């Protein structure tokens, strides 16, 4: 049984190592065992589960025509200049004071109304809202979720295989503990983007918003404002795994000349008859 278990893990890990693909944004080879269609299906399931969970908590879907139209227009403009313009992008607006936005694989995104307010919000104008949307679109096009799932697969396989082996040997307590560890790891570690993922989404998103005709200075304003607010608990959900706000503003400022050139080019093109 031990030999069989080791064989199972070895074969699975070998398959994982061989699942190299080309990153659609950087052009580099990366490990991702999922197809684009997997991303799309996973994203639909994630947004459906999120909507169901939110409704149980009393959070409704905001269907205000003006607000929804604004978001949809931003998504169309930004995704049109992205590396994956043909994905079935969709944005859902949740009516809640939570300060957050998120991206699921395959083009699904969620925005919480607590993020945007002209006076009190972290995001105060359309350019700043576009910066958030572009950041989330970048997570989608960089395929950060399924890359993270792939990176976490070796430990998942070890935990799962060890659980199967322990159960076969009659060690039920150990099997249950390992199975619980597998579920905790799968549910609590994998969905979070790494700081490297967040930094990449910042830089890619900055170029997306600029190419779409939104002022890239807005992205820097957001992180400077967040840094000034310090450890506001309302912001914790959005930034718990992100680089520090001041570091993000500094990194984006270095990219600003290139982004401004794209922004001016987009404005020139839009003004032509």
Go through the PLM ranges and name each one.
Residues 1-19:
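Sec-dependent bacterial lipoprotein signal peptides
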Residues 19-273:
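A Zn2+-metalloprotease active-site environment signal
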């Amino acid at each position: 049984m031990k030999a069989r278990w080791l064989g199972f893990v070895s074969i699975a890990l070998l398959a994982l190592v061989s699942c190299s693909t080309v990153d659609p944004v950087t052009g580099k080879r990366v490990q991702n065992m999922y197809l684009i269609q997997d991303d799309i299906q996973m994203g639909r399931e994630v947004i459906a589960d999120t909507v169901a969970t939110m409704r149980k908590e009393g959070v409704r879907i905001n269907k205000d025509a003006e607000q929804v139209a604004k978001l949809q227009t931003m998504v169309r403009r930004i995704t049109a200049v992205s590396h994956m313009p043909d994905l079935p992008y969709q944005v859902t607006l949740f009516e809640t004071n939570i300060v957050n936005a998120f991206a699921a694989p395959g083009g699904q995104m969620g925005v919480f109304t607590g993020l945007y307010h002209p006076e009190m919000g972290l995001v105060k104008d359309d350019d700043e809202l576009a910066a958030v949307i572009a950041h989330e679109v970048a997570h989608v096009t960089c395929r950060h979720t399924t890359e993270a799932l792939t990176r976490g697969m070796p430990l998942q396989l070890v935990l799962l295989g060890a659980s199967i082996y322990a159960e076969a040997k009659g060690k039920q307590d150990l099997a249950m503990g390992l199975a619980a560890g597998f579920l905790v790891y799968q549910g609590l570690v994998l969905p979070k983007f790494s700081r490297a993922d967040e930094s990449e989404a910042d830089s890619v998103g900055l170029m997306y918003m600029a190419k779409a005709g939104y002022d890239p200075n807005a992205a820097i304003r957001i992180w400077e404002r967040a840094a000034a607010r310090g450890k506001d608990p309302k912001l914790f959900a959005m930034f718990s795994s992100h680089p520090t706000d001041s570091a993000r503003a500094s990194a984006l400022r270095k990219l600003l000349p290139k982004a401004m050139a794209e922004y001016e080019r987009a404005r020139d093109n839009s003004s032509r008859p």
